[in-house]
Amino acid sequence: MSTILKSLPQGENVGIAFSGGLDTSAALLWMKQKGARVFAYTANLGQPDEADYDEIPRKAMEFGAEKARLVDCRSQLVHEGIAAIQAGAFHVSTGGIAYFNTTPLGRAVTGTMLVSAMKEDGVNIWGDGSTYKGNDIERFYRYGLLTNPDLRIYKPWLDQQFIDELGGRAEMSAFMTAAGFAYKMSSEKAYSTDSNLLGATHEAKDLERLDSGIKIVNPIMGVPFWRDDCAVKAETVAVRFVDGQPVALNGQTFADPVALFLEANAIGGRHGLGMSDQIENRIIEAKSRGIYEAPGMALLHIAYERLVTGIHNEDTIEQYRISGMRLGRLLYQGRWFDSQALMLRETAQRWVARAITGEVTLELRRGNDYSILNTESPNLTYAPERLSMEKVEDAPFTPADRIGQLTMRNLDITDTRAKLDIFAKAGLLSAGEGSHIPKLESDKG
């Protein structure tokens, strides 16, 4: 049996991820009028642009929902966000500035928690507003079926009858008005925005053009730091971790991780920290472009990675970065709870994060401009006396020790020379004058 329904299942319980916006409001009312028993579920993800969460379920009931629930997802979202920081699960970056996968993290939490709530209410059909060209249709599909194997999927935006009758925002607005709901369309922005407590995504419309950039965006979690009339003062902030968990900001300890994240967002947001412009590969391998905000994620990530580099050895750091790239891609693809992702994630949390205890002090300026002022940790393996250029007592090694170490390198150097000679004879290298490879004397003549 197909899990995707192409037309509305009349007379059955259908759950809809309800945002309260025009699209989902029109979809809910339309499904009700066509004979479905509609249940509305709203995820409280701490969206910074949402003024009143309690109003959303009330709207759903007005539009004909059998039941409307507000599901608080904030604690779980922050839990997953911290896990992503611990594992470095960020695979998209430009010029060293990362996209913190805030939308994929939000989808992982929304997809599992809303479907769990639906299952409690005996609702085994789920609809949402994702379109067939985006990533979310696949993310929600995976997370929904992982949570409820009996789930069937109905998306109004894949139903040709819905598209024919309510194919655009003007048609939806007229439909709502005709039904007695004076639903006024919000003014159209030059881009669309999706947000949660961890970050905001701005994309589509004018932002699809690469000659239209960050300057057309009105940040919702920070400040437009690129504007001359935007005053941004330098600020010092201290971030403390214990066993890989962020616990304090500027000496204030937080028992509630959600409260800590809200404060981290406020601090980073005052500077526009964590804003980035990325070109990425969607799940279907087509490229898309987004402008992202993630002030709290960026602040915690910077401090965490500073401690990682001061505590762990080179091979561990290398594995952390390689695994983090892979895990970030799995997260982006909607596979955050797949076994291969759990394996990578738990490894980083167990063998990297558990050693991360300490405090990092930074000076934040404009945007992603910052300086690290101090790093403290009882677990630091950074020991300046080991490599001090000054004369020290009880030096860890002597000139004679280094001579012996370099002599051992002769084995590797000899082998490397032999390989280069093979490559040169095969025509793969041009050695000598006019080449970037220096002329090498062959041991064999």
From Swiss-Prot:
Its main location: cytoplasm. One of its GO terms (biological process) is urea cycle. It catalyses: L-citrulline + L-aspartate + ATP = 2-(N(omega)-L-arginino)succinate + AMP + diphosphate + H(+). Pfam families: Arginosuc_syn_C, Arginosuc_synth. It comes from the Bacteria. Keywords: Amino-acid biosynthesis, Arginine biosynthesis, ATP-binding, Cytoplasm, Ligase, Nucleotide-binding. It is found in: Cytoplasm. InterPro entries: Arg_succ_synth_type2_subfam (IPR023437), Arginosuc_syn_C (IPR048268), Arginosuc_syn_N (IPR048267), Arginosuc_synth (IPR001518), Arginosuc_synth_CS (IPR018223), Arginosuc_synth_type_1_subfam (IPR023434), AS_cat/multimer_dom_body (IPR024074), AS_multimer_C_tail (IPR024073). L-citrulline binds at residues 99, 135, 139, 192, 201, 203, 280. GO terms for cellular component: cytoplasm. Pathway: Amino-acid biosynthesis; L-arginine biosynthesis; L-arginine from L-ornithine and carbamoyl phosphate: step 2/3. ATP binds at residues 17-25, 43, 129, 131, 136, 194. L-aspartate binds at residues 131, 135-136. Its EC number is 6.3.4.5. GO terms for molecular function: argininosuccinate synthase activity; ATP binding; protein homodimerization activity. The keyword Kinase does not apply. NCBIfam families: argG (TIGR00032), PRK05370.1 (NF003779). HAMAP family: Arg_succ_synth_type2. Homotetramer. This is Argininosuccinate synthase. It comes from Rhodopseudomonas palustris (strain BisA53).
